[in-house]
Amino acid sequence: MMTHTLPSEQTRLVPGSDSSSRPKKRRISKRSKIIVSTVVCIGLLLVLVQLAFPSSFALRSASHKKKNVIFFVTDGMGPASLSMARSFNQHVNDLPIDDILTLDEHFIGSSRTRSSDSLVTDSAAGATAFACALKSYNGAIGVDPHHRPCGTVLEAAKLAGYLTGLVVTTRITDATPASFSSHVDYRWQEDLIATHQLGEYPLGRVVDLLMGGGRSHFYPQGEKASPYGHHGARKDGRDLIDEAQSNGWQYVGDRKNFDSLLKSHGENVTLPFLGLFADNDIPFEIDRDEKEYPSLKEQVKVALGALEKASNEDKDSNGFFLMVEGSRIDHAGHQNDPASQVREVLAFDEAFQYVLEFAENSDTETVLVSTSDHETGGLVTSRQVTASYPQYVWYPQVLANATHSGEFLKRKLVDFVHEHKGASSKIENFIKHEILEKDLGIYDYTDSDLETLIHLDDNANAIQDKLNDMVSFRAQIGWTTHGHSAVDVNIYAYANKKATWSYVLNNLQGNHENTEVGQFLENFLELNLNEVTDLIRDTKHTSDFDATEIASEVQHYDEYYHELTN
């Protein structure tokens, strides 16, 4: 009888392969060999002509022209997410059926997403594939399958004379931004990630601009009187925000000060810049109080303005590399919350459109690439809700009726239950009129729906799950998981120069491994990740905690994600 062993993080997903190496080139057919030979001959001819007429030609690698790259990650956004958001947008804005999103206009290919140890990746391995151009295990942050730090595109760009930035709507220490700017064995090591991002590792500071949430990992646990907030998470007692400012970082942590930067389109930003606008994640777009939290588009406006100004003022600058993440598309997928997800996708599309207009008006060679690390939720825009033959419909208006996320409403309901413990009629009326009718626009709730919510009492995660399912059911939106799926994800791109656009298409058009996206970034910016890898071998990437403390950290991290997924 055959036995089967599940792969561990060190197990090769494909026997005979070594995922810690750069991906091998695809097998070349006879016809392709002929084409390659022809191209080589032409190339040699061009070199000879260049030697004879050196002023007439310039090799790409010797151009030394400024380049800007804005790399977008739509965390957890699969093809169905975009389809759902597009139809929602058409419906709520009374648009024709041929009206599409900005992203739609720039679709060029798709990406395969598996990690080194699973056909279903997580965000850490997915981002490491983009950042290091290699496959690693689920949970890996800027390290290979053997837990060795690997040089990232952002680090290499900084060392090559580019300015660098990271803009997100989750914690700045979360998996995607962390994988470009730090090296740790497991994604939950967010306190260590924060120190790397501020320059406490062999390369020193390599990030010029950090913007997003995650303030809690930058100041001590239990610091009730801290000027930065009331939910510090650091266990080592360090105040990294104070340390950063002492080391020359400009820090902004509230809307008022951010608005002064926004007004000048980032021109009054001083690099290095640290903007942390929430202790944890920035709220979902559907819940976001615009008086308190900046949008992704607003953050991007400031980031682009700051990086462009600094690049123009520095004659030695080669341009900039900026990573922008639509982070919470993923969280809406984990929570199976379609009303939140469509707003997250549309907010990202607005940010993408702003950057597109920036690139179109820039004289500097500029490339935009956007893709996802994976799909989340197993989303389908159809759902069989009866035992009879299924209807071929789904209803965007149900999502339009919802004015808050399940994440927001579970807290609202739990707070009310705690305040009115035992007052069952008050709680029932609150659920009916405040939560269901006012906040979700649901009037056809059943006795069974009410009974379930009442008996869940203060079980926040179960309340969230029930509310989101009530919306999904009525919209006839289906989900297959609270986790990730292995579906291929889309690649979108733009370049503002004709020759550059040809280069983009030659490298990213069609279907690719996610590591090939990382290779494209490396090659376009003329970087060498292997050289950077050699420089960071001594990076501290393991935890200082003993086994008991590590178990506690993992449990804390799992509990955080339990809130997202259940």
UniProtKB/Swiss-Prot annotation:
Query: Where do the record's region annotations for Disordered lie?
Result: 1-27
One GO MF term: fructose-2,6-bisphosphate 6-phosphatase activity
Q: Which residues carry this modification: Phosphoserine?
A: S123
Domain of life of the organism in this record? Eukaryota
An example of a Gene Ontology cellular component annotation for this protein is:
fungal-type vacuole membrane
Reported pH dependence? Optimum pH is 7.0 for farnesyl diphosphatase activity.
> Topology: which residues are Cytoplasmic?
1-33
Record text on cofactor binding: Binds 1 Mg(2+) ion.
One Pfam family per UniProt: Alk_phosphatase
Identify the InterPro entries for this entry: Alkaline_phosphatase, Alkaline_phosphatase_AS, Alkaline_phosphatase_core_sf
Q: Where is the composition biased (Polar residues)?
A: 1-11
What does this gene product do?
Phosphatase with broad substrate specificity. A truncated (soluble) version of the protein is responsible for the production of (E,E)-farnesol from (E,E)-farnesyl diphosphate. Acts as a fructose-2,6-bisphosphate 6-phosphatase.
Q: State what protein this is by name.
A: Repressible alkaline phosphatase
Q: What is the lineage of its organism?
A: Eukaryota, Fungi, Dikarya, Ascomycota, Saccharomycotina
